[in-house]
A protein has these predicted regions:
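Non-catalytic carbohydrate-binding regions of carbohydrate-active enzymes
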Residues: 488-525, 554-716
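Terminal accessory carbohydrate-recognition/targeting modules of carbohydrate-active enzymes
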Residues: 1-289, 614-618, 667-670, 685-748
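The feature captures the catalytic groove of carbohydrate-active enzymes
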Residues: 237-260, 265, 370-387, 403, ...
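An acidic- and aromatic-residue-enriched active-site/binding cleft used to recognize and process polar
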Residues: 102, 116, 126-130, 364, ...
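Secondary-structure transition/capping motifs at alpha-helix termini
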Residues: 88-90, 115-119, 346-351, 362-368, ...
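Substrate-binding groove/exosite segments of carbohydrate-active enzymes
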Residues: 218-225, 271-413, 466, 479, ...
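Active-site acid/base region of carbohydrate-active enzymes
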Residues: 288-309, 343-346, 350, 359, ...
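Short, well-ordered alpha-helical packing segments
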Residues: 110-112, 124-130, 142, 151-159, ...
Length: 748
């Protein structure tokens, strides 16, 4: 497999998300007009819905619509190729539309028309959009609507819900000079891409639109229809090309410039292909004999880029990865450390570094991190616990930077101080969960043990529960701060962080570990007693150095038990023997959006994979190594439709017995976990340490594995696995060979 084949490898017919890793994303969760030309279903500018973008219509010389019959569609990360057939005056016309969202926030339709037969035929292409204009309601309105030099431009003001309004400057036009145009205010009708609903069914005369701009009437509210038109003479068996584009940005001139650049390209959709190829060149190359693992590795890199934003506007000053599409199209603190773990393998660390810096840039006055950051305002109360310490140290093992450590140290120290001050009033070394939303794991039995109404209220100080997960996060943060302080020459601070981390470790071992059950449990701060509620988070200490030989049997007794967690598609977020357990997405009889009482969440699975693999390494336990490999394989295979290796997905949660995803939510490509970090560390066996790199592939029983272009501290690493042997190359030269189970330490 060649890198040039990667876009093609991911192609399929059942997908439609398009993005250029910037502000504009077209990923409608439930598209209604997918077969229509253009982009009529909703797009998102940042996390704000922007709809529609545009469609285009063919007319004959009398102004009647030429019917298009859609015959096939094929998607890949760079675009959608949609084919139609039309008939005009007895001539059959094959029409190919290539849709793409470019890195400069231009949604593009490249239209190729090719008539059959021996006669030329004239056709009119009208590209048009309809924008809501409701100034009296103060929800969505337009300003500065204008037509100039073939482009229509306008500023759209969007005020979703109670949020502050966001202004988007838009531009819309064709790649060829326009023959005519029209801008027309209308009372409301259905917002659909059907020519019969437009005002121009009566106004397109003599082969032209009226060339007017009518934006006033008895009242100002309604729909503003905007169109540009081009007449084309199609010659027999000859391709005629025309592109339609819609640009969005903060400034009108920027949108118009971006649109002009795109429309003047000979092959404008090539800008998208180049951008995606460049992205795949910027990460390690991986392939193996398991097509599920190979496909998912590259699919994951697609998902990370799809949800990346590089826009520098408002609260956003750095690049970062959003948690997902739609509502999730923002930096969200629970998922950001996972993005750091995966993006640290990119050749350039800027994106991984930006995930943390974005939250430090927007840190609260009390030291806490905001749970969700909008581009132009802050939401009140939202907060999520997250493992920033692990992500920071893992990033530093690949791309060490004193400058970066210095940039994040004070912010993370303030964050730790917030927890000590606000989340541990007993000074116990264990830290509080205040509501069931802030863990990112709502609707679980664990919270009801301290408050019977814990699932009734959402944000704020609802209850107090000393959580295993949040306490482990704080332990790893203070360990990381100790390392950072040492490297920054703050030796006294480093010693203090180590003492504080040791206090947390002791508290977890003494207060959360149940020697009889052989399980870590949350603690009720009112009684100081363990809750004895089994949740997948109870295994989180196993991915740290908190555990020792005493705890070995616990992971086997519970995690590998089919009656608790080792389901066909492990692991459920709550144990199968929990009284609130449900494999269906139901909580107390009602289907929910995000229940954690039995569904398999990729986010949990990433943590559990790390816990199981770390335990295998710590205990030097071959049976656990095999189980860890088995688990990662099951985890990845779960995220394919109908076990089809060509149709990967990543939804919020899955059924632990059937692997059925939460498709009813419409949220695919949800970056709320990490996968490629696991594949590189355990399938390929590359685990960077402070002064060396351990090469130790796990027993996945693969006939072939190859990873190349892994850059660690400026050195290039390549590893291949063939059966039970593996080989290492360093900087393009053969380094050494070994056998699975006999790891090699490479000094880098």
């Amino acid at each position: 497999m060649k890198r040039s084949d990667l876009i093609k490898r991911l192609s399929r017919t059942d997908k439609w998300y398009l993005g250029g890793a910037n502000r504009l994303l077209w990923a409608p969760p439930f598209p209604v007009f997918l077969d229509s030309p253009g982009f009529w279903d909703e797009a998102h500018y940042y996390n704000v819905e922007l709809k529609p973008l545009f469609t285009w219509t063919l007319l004959n010389d009398e102004g009647a619509e030429v019917t298009l019959t859609q015959i096939r569609r094929k998607w890949d990360p760079a675009g959608i190729r949609q084919e139609y057939i039309a008939k005009l005056k007895g001539v059959s016309i094959k029409i190919t539309e290539v849709k793409a969202v470019l890195p400069n926030d231009v949604a593009l339709s490249e239209v190729i028309l090719k008539p059959s037969g021996r006669r030329s035929v004239k056709v009119h292409v009208v590209a048009w959009t309809t924008q809501e204009h409701e100034p009296s309601k103060n929800t969505s309105w337009l300003e500065d609507v204008d037509y100039r030099s073939g482009l229509i431009s306008f500023r759209r003001h969007l005020r979703p819900s109670v949020s502050p309004q966001l202004e988007v400057a838009c531009a819309f036009g064709l790649s060829r000079p326009c023959n005519s145009h029209s801008i027309n205010l209308s009372e409301r009708t259905a917002l659909q891409p059907h020519w019969k609903l437009t005002p121009w069914t009566d106004l397109f005369k003599d082969g032209c639109l009226p060339g007017d701009k009518k934006l006033t009437g008895a009242h100002s509210d309604g729909l503003v229809y905007m169109a540009v038109h081009r007449e084309l003479l199609l010659r027999p068996a000859t391709e005629t090309r025309l592109s339609v584009g819609f640009a969005a940005s903060p400034a009108s001139q920027e949108s118009q410039n971006n649109l002009s650049v795109a429309l003047h390209q000979k092959d404008p959709s090539a800008l998208s292909r180049t951008s995606w190829n460049d992205h795949f060149l910027a990460v390690p190359f991986f392939e193996c004999s398991d097509e599920f693992l190979t496909t998912y590795y590259w699919y994951r890199w697609y998902g990370l880029k799809l949800n990346t934003e590089y826009g520098t506007e408002g609260n956003y000053k750095r690049p970062f990865v959003c948690e997902g599409i739609g509502y999730f199209r923002a930096p969200i603190s629970y998922s950001a450390p996972g993005h750091m773990l995966e993006n640290r393998w990119m050749h350039d660390p800027a994106l991984a570094q930006g995930s943390l810096l974005t939250f430090i840039d927007n840190q609260r006055e009390d030291g806490g991190f905001r749970g969700y950051i909008d581009v132009n305002h802050y939401r009140q109360e939202m907060f999520y616990h997250a493992n920033w310490g692990r992500a920071l140290l893992q990033l530093e093992t690949l791309h060490p930077s004193l400058e970066y450590l210095g940039a994040v140290y004070d912010g993370l120290a303030r964050y730790a101080a917030y927890f000590d001050r606000e989340r541990d009033e007993e000074v116990s070394g264990l830290y509080d969960i205040d509501n069931h939303y802030e863990t990112g794991q709502e609707y679980m039995h664990r919270y009801l043990e301290v408050d019977a109404h814990a699932d009734q209220d959402h944000w704020g100080s609802v209850f107090r529960l000393k959580g295993v997960d949040v306490t482990v996060y704080m332990y790893e943060l203070k360990c990381a701060l100790a390392v950072a302080a040492d490297r920054l020459g703050k030796s006294d601070a480093a010693e203090l962080w180590r003492l504080e981390a040791e206090k947390i470790k002791t508290a977890i071992l003494q207060k959360m570990w149940d020697p009889s059950d052989e399980m870590f449990y949350d603690v009720d701060p009112k009684t100081g007693l363990r809750t004895n509620v089994k949740a997948a988070t109870c295994f989180y200490p196993y991915f740290t150095d908190i555990v020792n030989e005493t705890h070995r049997n616990g992971v086997k007794r519970h995690l590998l038990n089919p009656r608790e967690y080792w389901t066909r598609f492990p692991v459920p977020s709550s144990s199968c023997d929990d009284k609130y357990f449900s494999d269906a997405p139901e909580w107390k009889g009602k289907r929910m959006n995000c229940p954690w009482n039995g569904r398999v969440w990729p986010m949990t699975n990433s943590h559990i994979a790390e816990a199981l693999a770390s335990a295998a390494v710590m205990y030097r336990d071959e049976s656990l190594r095999k189980r860890a490999a088995e688990f990662i394989l099951k985890f990845v295979r779960m995220m394919f439709f109908e076990a089809d290796p060509s149709r990967p997905n990543c939804f919020e949660h899955y059924n632990p017995f059937t692997g059925q995803p939460s498709a009813y939510r419409g949220v695919d490509d949800y970056q709320h976990s990490w996968v490629n970090d696991l594949l590189i560390k355990y399938v390929c066996g590359i685990r960077p340490e402070e002064f060396s790199v351990l090469i130790d592939p796990f027993p996945f029983n693969l006939s072939h594995v190859m990873i190349d272009d892994v850059y660690i501290r400026g050195r290039r690493l390549k590893v291949t696995v063939s059966g039970k042997r593996f080989t290492i190359w360093l900087d393009g030269k053969h380094h050494t060979e070994s056998t699975l189970g006999d790891p090699i330490q490479v000094q880098i």
